[in-house]
């Protein structure tokens, strides 16, 4: 019998492997990305304190696009999270793609955050 592959379970296993290697500090926190079917979320996390420093998503009140699940929305979230991080004095981060392929919405968010001033 052939079993169907659960893509989200595979992603979670991949993310667990990645998280063993990626660790955010106060000087260089972790930029974590979560992607759902309708929205995209980004958090800047200090793993030493286990605290979220900055976050942005397509659910924010500042978000003004009609569609929340496309590349344009991801770019807007990347710009928002970078702007908020720079306001808090964070310039360098470690990028955590969350087990997703570095393509499409994840890549668009990362590129927009880089263009807005974050270094990774």
Swiss-Prot record:
CDD domains: Ribosomal_L18_L5e. InterPro entries: Ribosomal_uL18_bac-type, Ribosomal_uL18_bac/euk. GO terms for biological process: translation. The keyword Ligase does not apply. The keyword Ribonucleoprotein applies. GO terms for cellular component: cytosolic large ribosomal subunit. Transmembrane segments: none annotated. GO terms for molecular function: 5S rRNA binding; structural constituent of ribosome. Keywords: Ribonucleoprotein, Ribosomal protein, RNA-binding, rRNA-binding. It comes from the Bacteria. Belongs to the universal ribosomal protein uL18 family. Part of the 50S ribosomal subunit; part of the 5S rRNA/L5/L18/L25 subcomplex. Contacts the 5S and 23S rRNAs. This is one of the proteins that bind and probably mediate the attachment of the 5S RNA into the large ribosomal subunit, where it forms part of the central protuberance. This is Large ribosomal subunit protein uL18. The lineage of its organism: Bacteria, Bacillati, Bacillota, Bacilli, Bacillales.
């Amino acid at each position: 019998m052939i079993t169907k592959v659960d893509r989200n379970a595979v992603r979670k296993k991949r993310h667990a492997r990645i998280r063993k290697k990626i660790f955010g500090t106060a000087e260089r926190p972790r930029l974590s990305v979560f992607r759902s079917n309708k929205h995209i979320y980004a958090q800047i996390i200090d793993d030493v304190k286990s605290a979220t420093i900055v976050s942005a998503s397509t659910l924010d009140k500042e978000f003004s696009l009609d569609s929340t699940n496309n590349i344009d929305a991801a770019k807007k979230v990347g710009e928002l999270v970078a702007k908020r991080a720079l306001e808090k004095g964070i310039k360098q981060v470690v990028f955590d793609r969350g087990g997703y392929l570095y393509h499409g919405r994840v890549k668009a968010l990362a590129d927009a955050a880089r263009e807005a001033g974050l270094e990774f």
